A protein has these predicted regions:
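Single conserved hydrophobic/aromatic residue that forms the stacking wall/gate
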Residues: 2-13, 306, 313-316
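Conserved small-residue
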Residues: 23-29, 33, 40-135, 175
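Short loop/turn motifs that connect adjacent beta-strands in outer-membrane beta-barrel proteins
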Residues: 42-49, 62-67, 240-254, 308
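Extracytoplasmic gating/loop element in the C-terminal half of outer-membrane beta-barrel translocons
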Residues: 161-253, 257-259
Length: 316
């Protein structure tokens, strides 16, 4: 007995056996440089001035994205958030997207002419589609000085950050509920001034247009440029001949140290270093950050002479 079987196989349904896959999302170009200059402008037997300057800058550009990606959202993008971090061809890492005021061809804000929001600015970018800034600075600089006179030493450190934008959702939330200083002043005046235009509907402006985490991102973007006195320390080292007379002490140094003393210049009404986190998806975002700590400290550094072996045994 012979059994004969014949089968035909048509096209197989091309369903991929996975929900997600990893791809090389794009091509990002980074270009940067760093310069450090050390100098001793003054050097005498009693007085010395040493200084060091560090200057750095970095630029990045998204050259290409994966063929299936028009943009890559790597931060919050829901309706309840007024910003999104996106990668777009031609853009940069750190670009912040959100909502902005509608503007005419000359760059002037367009105002609504009818409805409940008549007289209030028009807004575009629902879904966070308008680029409103980039969190990265154009450059950063640190400059320190050390002045020494006999046993005294004074150290100063200046930090300068130039450029970059930061979004304050703290200010947006406070404005929404009318508990910020700017809303109090606006209520007292009876109007808000927006780029030279007077708006009489103060409550409507803050509550219905710009305020809150779903408000106008552009309105709460601040320049992160700042110059601060980062650290100051004053040291005094006692003369060696004084220490020798004690027969116990080898060195004795007293020091006063202060950090985050003050800003010499800043545009934002808060510390631009107070970002939500250092992760890529939260660069340049400030949300109810704790105030910067200013620390003051005093230290005493003591070193002792080594006791002789027979003296050590005698005291044991």
């Amino acid at each position: 007995r012979d059994d004969v079987e014949s089968r035909g196989l048509g096209d197989v349904y091309k369903r991929q056996p996975y929900a997600y896959r990893y791809v090389n999302a794009g091509d990002i170009q980074n270009r940067g440089w760093e310069l450090t200059v050390d100098a001793t402008p003054v050097l005498t037997p009693d007085f010395t001035w040493k200084t060091s300057l560090n200057f750095s800058s970095n630029r990045n550009k998204i050259k290409e994205l994966h063929e299936e990606l028009k943009e890559l959202v790597y931060g919050p993008s829901s309706f309840s958030s007024s910003y999104a971090m996106k990668l777009v061809k031609g853009g940069s890492i750190g670009d912040i997207y959100g909502k902005a005021f509608v503007r005419d061809a000359e760059g002037n804000i367009v105002y609504q002419t009818e409805g409940d929001h008549k007289g209030l600015p028009a807004v575009e970018g629902e879904g966070n589609t308008i680029k409103v800034g980039n969190a990265n600075p154009r450059f950063i600089m640190g400059w320190n000085h050390t002045f020494s006179y006999k046993g005294f030493s004074l150290y100063l450190l200046l930090d300068w950050r130039y450029g970059g934008k930061i979004l304050s959702q703290t200010q947006a939330e406070m404005d929404l509920y009318g508990v910020s200083q700017v809303t109090a002043l606006a209520r007292d005046r009876g109007y808000v001034t927006l780029e030279g235009q007077q708006i009489d509907n103060v409550k409507g402006f803050y509550k219905n247009i710009v305020g809150g985490r779903a408000g106008v991102t552009e309105y709460y973007m601040y320049d992160a440029t700042n110059l601060r006195l980062r650290e100051v320390s004053l040291n005094y080292t006692f003369p060696k001949k004084w220490m020798q007379k004690t027969k116990v002490l080898k060195d004795l140094q007293l020091a006063f140290v202060a950090r985050n003393l003050c800003f010499l210049y800043k545009k934002a009404p808060f510390d631009p270093d107070l970002v939500l986190s250092t992760g890529n998806d939260n660069q340049g975002i400030e949300v109810f950050g704790m105030p910067t700590t200013r620390s003051l400290g005093f230290t005493v550094t003591v070193s002792y002479t080594h006791l002789r072996a027979h003296e050590t045994r005698r005291h044991l």
